[in-house]
């Protein structure tokens, strides 16, 4: 009797794993299609799922990615001038060399993000979270909404440019 129950439970578990794998693949296809629509010119992607998508080397000015899930996305060397990211999850994002002039990053989660060498002229960072974010070489000198409390958990280097009166701890060498 117990053996039959155990076999039934194992079979259900195997079916569940197969369903999860299919769902994961379907989600991956959906995320890639959403990213492609953005690249092709779609402006609004409010609260969309862009987990782990590759948007590197793209010109995505004026896009509305408010509330989007960009966790682990590759945004390296892309341009997001006048884009809206308010409330987005940008944790563990690769934002190397990203340009975002006049963009809105209000309430964005940048935990563990690599924002090395980015340019954020005139962008807003009210209530953004920078836990363990690397801002080395980035220019935030004309950004607004940054506070010392926000930056206390991030790091940078001698090339990082911040608004007057704000400082960053140096990043630890790997």
Regions found by a protein language model. Give the residues of each.
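Bacterial N-terminal signal peptides
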Residues: 6-16
